[in-house]
């Protein structure tokens, strides 16, 4: 529609609501506790530095975002404590429920020894002085886990049958067959001779469809059960179940039982215990969801369903892997994996927010060797450490991620120093606007000191087990111009 003024055309401007935006009522409203927690989490995600705000200032921010909300400072404080979002000594930790042991048969790098201590548990220590930049060791995965997201592409020959790397059109057609990189039973292909050699489980997992054969080895793995489990893991985005299925298959195929011995010696904890920490921290906040995936009853039902599918892959595992051991395997995998894979020597490294090693994954291939360098000079007898979390995160972020995912509250020197600085700022008149640039410079300086010249890999937010939003909000309103 066009309005005509003095013979000229002038567009008519109209304000429209888009997406799922709902205009808040001007009447006072008492929000649900989940709404308050979700809003606080949103504030922290938008500005990580706001996580260090005291309750009064945080309450003021919530009120400024939702003027009609009837919520007191006392209620905000109570909810933060209830959901484990205030760092206190009463927060749930499970480090004392994690157990590991030393296996003498492990071949360690020449400059490294493994030691068990009462305070740190099992860890790696330097036998001699190590210079900054020295390669301490390199290793291939003990258990390789391909990308779950590519399993459908693997089945149609569009991704490598072992490493799941995407194949080009040229490599996924006749050329691979000529090079002997195709399977003569199914459509799957390998990207290289190395991957084909490493893929010792392909026939057992993909072609052994009968679990009732009289052959002793043929009934260890039921391929039809594995394909069903693979589909289920893909649908639920459940990487841990997929991973421990592959790990158990590897252990079953290892006649020396060495791999089973190594896996059982790693830091072990039940996934049930880890889930308590998730529930005590406003759900899976650190997986960008802002809420628990399921209430405990639903989660236990999911675990049981996964366990039943696991048993269909391994018909003889009913006695060898009871449900509690299944949960222990899942917890063990979750606290030891690096980029979904398990590395034997690297799994011995304990955490520090100011680590003295630089762990670098292979840039050429996920199946390639992991390399561990000295990030600074390391004295003989000094413990080797790595960072389990992104060192550029704030103190509160790091502490929460470590408590939920690994069961402890870090007390390294960097955390102590930052905690003292945080308390000093809180006891002062507050951080003024003029102090912000200097604080940012200090943060960047600390991060540079922590990570050296290595790059920071930022995680892509994912939602596990949930659906993506079907709309994208760019603004509360959009201007529509009709001409």
Swiss-Prot record:
Chemical reaction(s) catalysed: L-lysyl-[histone] + S-adenosyl-L-methionine = N(6)-methyl-L-lysyl-[histone] + S-adenosyl-L-homocysteine + H(+)
Top-level taxon: Eukaryota
Coiled coil segments of this chain: none
A GO CC annotation given for this chain: cytoplasm
InterPro entries recorded: SET_dom, SET_dom_sf
Residue segments, region Disordered: 420-439
One Pfam family per UniProt: SET
Record carries keyword Methyltransferase: yes
This protein's UniProt keywords: Chromosome, Cytoplasm, Methyltransferase, Nucleus, S-adenosyl-L-methionine, Transferase
Database matches in CDD domains: SET_SMYD
Residue ranges occupied by any SET domain in the UniProt entry: 110-389
Subcellular location: Nucleus; Chromosome; Cytoplasm
MF GO annotations: histone H4K20 methyltransferase activity
Enzyme Commission no: 2.1.1.-
One Gene Ontology biological process: methylation
Its biological purpose: Histone methyltransferase that monomethylates 'Lys-5', 'Lys-8' and 'Lys-12' of histone H4 (H4K5me1, H4K8me1 and H4K12me1, respectively), thereby controlling gene expression and remodeling chromatin structures.
Family listed: Belongs to the class V-like SAM-binding methyltransferase superfamily. Histone-lysine methyltransferase family. SET5 subfamily.
Name of protein: Histone-lysine N-methyltransferase SET5
């Amino acid at each position: 529609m066009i309005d005509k003024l003095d013979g000229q055309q002038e567009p008519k401007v109209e304000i429209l609501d888009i997406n799922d935006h709902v205009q808040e009522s001007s009447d006072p409203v008492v929000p649900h506790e989940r709404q308050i927690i979700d809003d606080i989490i949103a504030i922290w995600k938008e500005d990580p530095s706001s996580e260090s705000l005291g309750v009064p200032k945080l309450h003021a921010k919530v009120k400024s975002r939702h003027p009609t909300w009837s919520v007191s400072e006392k209620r905000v404080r109570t909810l933060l404590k209830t959901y484990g979002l205030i760092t206190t000594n009463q927060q749930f930790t499970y480090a004392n429920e994690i157990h590991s042991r030393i296996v003498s048969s492990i071949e360690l790098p020449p400059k490294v020894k493994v030691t068990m201590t009462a305070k740190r548990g099992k860890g790696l220590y330097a036998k001699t002085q190590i210079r900054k930049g020295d390669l301490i060791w390199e290793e291939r995965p003990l258990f390789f886990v391909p990308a779950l997201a590519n399993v459908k592409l693997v089945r149609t020959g569009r991704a490598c049958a072992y490493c799941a790397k995407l194949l080009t059109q040229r490599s996924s057609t006749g050329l691979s067959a000529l090079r002997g990189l195709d399977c003569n039973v199914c459509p799957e292909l390998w990207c290289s001779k190395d991957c084909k050699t490493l893929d010792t489980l392909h026939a057992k997992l993909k072609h052994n469809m009968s679990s009732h054969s009289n052959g002793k080895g043929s009934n260890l793995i039921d391929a039809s059960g594995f394909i069903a489990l693979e589909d289920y893991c893909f649908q639920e985005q459940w990487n841990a179940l997929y991973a421990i299925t592959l790990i158990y298959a590897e252990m079953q195929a290892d006649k020396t039982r060495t791999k089973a011995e190594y896996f059982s010696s790693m830091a072990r904890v039940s996934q049930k215990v880890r889930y308590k920490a998730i529930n005590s921290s406003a759900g899976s906040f650190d997986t960008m969801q802002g809420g628990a995936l399921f209430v405990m009853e639903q989660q236990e039902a999911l675990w049981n369903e996964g366990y039943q599918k696991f048993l269909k892959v391994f018909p003889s595992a009913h006695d060898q892997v009871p449900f509690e051991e299944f949960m222990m395997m899942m917890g063990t995998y979750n606290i030891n994996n690096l980029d979904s894979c398990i590395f034997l020597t690297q799994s011995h490294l304990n955490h520090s927010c100011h680590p003295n090693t630089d762990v670098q994954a292979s840039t050429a291939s996920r199946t390639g060797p992991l390399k561990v360098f000295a990030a600074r000079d390391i004295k003989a007898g000094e413990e080797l450490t790595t960072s389990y979390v992104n060192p550029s995160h704030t103190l509160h972020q790091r502490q929460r991620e470590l408590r939920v995912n690994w069961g402890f509250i870090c007390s390294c020197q960097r955390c102590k120093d930052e905690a003292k600085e945080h308390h000093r700022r809180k006891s002062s008149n507050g951080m003024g606007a003029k102090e912000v640039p200097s604080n940012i410079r200090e943060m960047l300086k600390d991060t540079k000191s922590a990570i050296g010249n290595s790059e920071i890999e930022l995680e892509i937010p994912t939602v596990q087990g949930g659906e993506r939003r079907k709309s994208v909000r760019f603004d509360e309103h959009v201007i529509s111009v009709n001409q």
